[in-house]
């Protein structure tokens, strides 16, 4: 009797295990089918400057979630576009296609391209000549969603990229160039103008040739500005190189930040100018090379404490300060390893070789940035000309001030 029961239970267990295996196999087949269907559903639409194979308007009207639109080389004149609530990648193929506004007002959307929600990636495109009747014409204007801009150029636009207030929006800019602000007296045209969004990340990018406006202006709750060349040129006429008027959680690491002799403002990095900060406010500034071409003293970094909460935290370590000026005077916080220098102490400032010259007394003079309180502020990369980054070797035990460890 016991033997019979053992056989019965063994058979039941074997059938149960087989059923489970069959169920799992069926689930895997179903998932594979769904993934295959999704992969097959994603399409690549090709656009040409003369409208063949498709025009940009036609491609945008046909595109579905997950699709890619590829632009052939050439100039796309008056190719205004609205991208709404989709997952979409638009990339240039080969030589960077030019999206041209021709220096004329761009209509109701005040941008060459308007990104309205969704998850959008723009790659290998150039936006030039955006204008609007109110002076706020943008190459790309973001109204919500997540936008990634990668390997794109923005020249001669009233705003290169303009992100409007939306506390859930995110903007990422990688390996791009923003420059040549229109020379309009009183225009205040910023190369990058970011409203009160959730997060801004900028890396491996170059900002140059501003005029009266700022190179970077961000009111984001979190601003990560790392490994960029934010340098207006020796005769540049921008105002602030970086302005963070609403405070927030700001990380500024590994950048070259240069202010031209014709700048209308001697402050290079400004934090908290609005008096309307976020609920959490921390400024981390590490391993930047600040360069002032003015004869009068610069104010390399200014924290507007009067408009910030009492618990605002400021940490600045291992920055290289080239030229006459002030850095931490009057600013609350922790400062260490920041070193003054003149251009002659650099390898070759005239050719933008801003690393310390061989034999400099400042080589290896920085503090260990991996142990600043409970934070690791060590740079993981360096800006690599003309755009992009170069990873630093792991295992470093000595640190030099500034954006370069060469």
Segments from the language model and where they lie:
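N-terminal secretory signal peptides that target proteins for export/translocation
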Residues: 1-20
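Bacterial N-terminal signal peptides
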Residues: 24-36
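Sec/Tat signal peptide C-region and signal peptidase I cleavage site
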Residues: 37-41
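Acidic Gly/Asp/Thr-rich repetitive segments characteristic of extracellular carbohydrate-active
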Residues: 43-72, 76-78, 360-363
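Right-handed parallel beta-helix/beta-spiral solenoid domain characteristic of secreted/periplasmic
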Residues: 44, 48-54, 68-70, 86-135, ...
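Acidic glycine-/aspartate-rich tracts in secreted/extracellular proteins
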Residues: 74-76, 94-96, 366-370
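Glycine- and acidic/polar-rich repeat regions and solenoidal domains
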Residues: 80-81, 98-115, 127-355, 359-360, ...
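Surface beta-loop-beta hairpin patches that serve as ligand-binding interfaces in beta-rich domains
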Residues: 359-406
């Amino acid at each position: 009797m016991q033997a019979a029961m053992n056989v019965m239970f063994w058979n039941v267990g074997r059938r149960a295990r087989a059923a489970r295996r069959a169920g799992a196999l069926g689930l895997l087949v179903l998932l594979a089918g769904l993934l295959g269907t999704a992969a097959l559903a994603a399409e690549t639409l090709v656009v040409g400057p003369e409208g063949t194979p498709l025009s940009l308007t036609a491609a945008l009207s046909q595109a579905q979630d997950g699709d890619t639109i590829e632009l052939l080389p050439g100039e796309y004149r008056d190719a205004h576009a609205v991208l709404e609530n989709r997952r979409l990648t638009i990339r240039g193929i080969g030589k960077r296609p030019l999206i041209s506004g021709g220096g004329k007002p761009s209509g109701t959307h005040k941008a060459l391209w308007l990104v309205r929600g969704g998850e959008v990636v723009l790659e290998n495109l150039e936006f030039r000549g955006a204008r609007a009747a109110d002076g706020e014409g943008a190459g790309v204007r973001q109204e919500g969603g997540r936008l990634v801009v990668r390997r794109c150029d923005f020249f001669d636009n009233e705003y290169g990229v303009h992100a409007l207030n939306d506390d859930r929006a995110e903007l990422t800019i990688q390996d791009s160039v923003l420059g040549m602000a229109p020379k309009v007296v009183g225009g205040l045209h910023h190369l990058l103008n970011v409203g009160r969004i959730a997060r801004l990340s900028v890396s491996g990018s170059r900002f140059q040739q501003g005029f009266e406006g700022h190179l970077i202006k961000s009111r984001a709750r979190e601003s990560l500005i790392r490994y960029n060349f934010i340098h207006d040129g020796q005769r540049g006429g921008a105002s602030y190189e970086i302005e963070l008027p609403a405070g927030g959680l700001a990380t500024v690491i590994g950048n070259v930040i240069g202010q031209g002799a014709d700048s209308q403002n001697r402050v290079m990095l400004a934090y908290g100018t609005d008096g309307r900060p976020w609920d959490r406010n921390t400024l981390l500034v590490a391993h930047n090379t600040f360069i002032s071409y003015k004869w009068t003293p610069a104010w390399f970094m200014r924290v507007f404490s009067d408009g910030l909460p009492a618990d605002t935290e400021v940490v600045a370590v291992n920055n290289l300060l080239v030229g006459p000026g002030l850095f931490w005077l009057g600013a609350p916080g922790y400062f260490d390893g920041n070193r003054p220098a003149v251009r002659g102490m650099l390898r070759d400032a005239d050719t933008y070789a801003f690393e310390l010259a061989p034999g400099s007394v400042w080589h290896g003079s920085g503090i260990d940035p991996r142990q600043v309180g409970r934070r690791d502020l060590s740079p993981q990369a360096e800006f690599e000309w003309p755009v992009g980054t170069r990873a630093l070797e792991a295992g470093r035990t000595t640190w030099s001030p500034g954006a370069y460890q060469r």
